[in-house]
Amino acid sequence: MKDKYGREIDYLRISLTDKCNLRCAYCMEKDHNDFIHNDKLMTLDEILRVVKECASIGIKKVRLTGGEPLVREGVVDLIKNINKIPEIEEICLTTNGILLGDKVKELSENGLKRVNISLDTLKEDRFKEITRIGTLDKVLYSIEKCLENNVKVKINTIILEDFNKDEILDLINLAYKNPIDLRFIELMPIGEGKKFKGVTNSEILEIIKKEKKVLSDGKTLRLNGPAKYISIEGFKGKIGFISAMSDCFCEDCNRIRVTPEGFMKQCLHWKYGINLRDKMRNGISDEELREIIKKSIYEKPEKHNFKMKEKDEDKRFMYEIGG
């Protein structure tokens, strides 16, 4: 369905949990352990109910996020049941990759088509530094197993000043021999991210252009999402740029989000939305739930305003909202 600005909203992102098995420095405090109680999370049945009603009004793609979605029990069955909904054309997962390698075969067999894996460095010492407790080999193993099981892979990378800027060319080489898309995502000033200085995608592109033959400039190659892609001579995969800060893409936004506790967010930046979990637990019918979702989608804000401090901005961290 369309929102009031005429944008076709066909993509639902649902966060299964705020829990994570890493503590990435720009996302979560090192000693954080105060997570949403299980009884406050949407149950898997409630999640499935939301997906069904969203599908009935035009949602075609579902992405499961977190936190780290694979720390939530029952993910395989949830994907299996979502895959039975006729209107849903694609089920995707955003993950840090630590637990994915040993689960991807079963996930794929039950309907998972794509994964986005967060990876900011190819150096073990830096990986430990940024994630605090992670193991790089597990992520690389997960990428390998995804390719073996025909699950399409996108790598999400954040470049930070004075941390991994010198690895840009090494990182894009992941897309050289493999059909992997690597996307550079500009750091957004949410939660712990406000403490770091990110590198703009225009600067990253210039670094790439100095060393590689770019076949397309990315100005028009946008494929059903916020990323603009370039092709590099000899590369099997593409290089993408998600420039939320320097190149606002809100006019093409096609998504709606639901947090772990069932709050349907109209926009990542703003605090507007409605708690679907509470409505369901208060006994509303499927038809009433559908109408609430339709109204929330229709009232989606025109754009974010991350560059300005606003009284109505969402103060929560990314892992609480759903990355």
Swiss-Prot record:
One of its GO terms (molecular function) is metal ion binding. InterPro entries: Aldolase_TIM, Elp3/MiaA/NifB-like_rSAM, MoaA, MoaA_NifB_PqqE_Fe-S-bd_CS, MoaA_twitch, MoCo_biosynth_MoaA/MoaC, rSAM. GTP binds at residues 13, 63, 94, 154, 255-257. Its EC number is 4.1.99.22. The keyword Iron applies. Pfam families: Fer4_12, Mob_synth_C, Radical_SAM. Binds 2 [4Fe-4S] clusters. Binds 1 [4Fe-4S] cluster coordinated with 3 cysteines and an exchangeable S-adenosyl-L-methionine and 1 [4Fe-4S] cluster coordinated with 3 cysteines and the GTP-derived substrate. PROSITE patterns: MOAA_NIFB_PQQE, RADICAL_SAM. It comes from the Bacteria. It catalyses: GTP + AH2 + S-adenosyl-L-methionine = (8S)-3',8-cyclo-7,8-dihydroguanosine 5'-triphosphate + 5'-deoxyadenosine + L-methionine + A + H(+). Pathway: Cofactor biosynthesis; molybdopterin biosynthesis. Residues 4-233 form the Radical SAM core domain. Its cofactor is [4Fe-4S] cluster. Keywords: 4Fe-4S, GTP-binding, Iron, Iron-sulfur, Lyase, Metal-binding, Molybdenum cofactor biosynthesis, Nucleotide-binding, S-adenosyl-L-methionine. S-adenosyl-L-methionine binds at residues 26, 67, 118, 188. [4Fe-4S] cluster 1 binds at residues 20, 24, 27. GO terms for biological process: Mo-molybdopterin cofactor biosynthetic process. It is an enzyme of class 4 (lyase). [4Fe-4S] cluster 2 binds at residues 250, 253, 267. Monomer and homodimer. Belongs to the radical SAM superfamily. MoaA family. Catalyzes the cyclization of GTP to (8S)-3',8-cyclo-7,8-dihydroguanosine 5'-triphosphate. This is GTP 3',8-cyclase. It comes from Clostridium perfringens (strain ATCC 13124 / DSM 756 / JCM 1290 / NCIMB 6125 / NCTC 8237 / Type A).
